[in-house]
């Protein structure tokens, strides 16, 4: 099999990339606030996973879904939590 494989072919017309970027943009607020050591770790792992393994934001979010969900609930960030859960239900 030659060429690249698009593992998101079933997500055609779902805007998964834009939706993932929106969630990451909202998570950036938590990363910048640095109120929990996890956020620095998450930012570092995101960079590593993207650069070294070629993973996109949807996959990075999926890798940390339970922790992200818990922290967003604890912080009362229900809007970002809803966006994350929508990604989970529709695209993960």
From Swiss-Prot:
Keywords: Nitrogen fixation. It holds the Pfam family CowN. One of its GO terms (biological process) is nitrogen fixation. Belongs to the CowN family. Is required to sustain N(2)-dependent growth in the presence of low levels of carbon monoxide (CO). Probably acts by protecting the N(2) fixation ability of the nitrogenase complex, which is inactivated in the presence of CO. This is N(2)-fixation sustaining protein CowN. It comes from Rhodopseudomonas palustris (strain BisB5). The gene is cowN.
């Amino acid at each position: 099999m030659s060429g690249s494989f698009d593992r998101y072919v079933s997500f055609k017309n779902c805007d998964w990339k834009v939706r993932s970027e929106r969630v990451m943009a909202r998570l950036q607020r938590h990363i910048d606030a640095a109120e929990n050591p996890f956020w620095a770790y998450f930012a570092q792992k995101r960079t590593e996973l993207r650069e070294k393994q070629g993973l996109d934001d949807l996959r990075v979010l999926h890798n940390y879904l339970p922790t992200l969900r818990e922290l967003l609930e604890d912080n009362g960030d229900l809007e970002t939590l809803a966006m994350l859960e929508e990604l989970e239900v529709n695209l993960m």
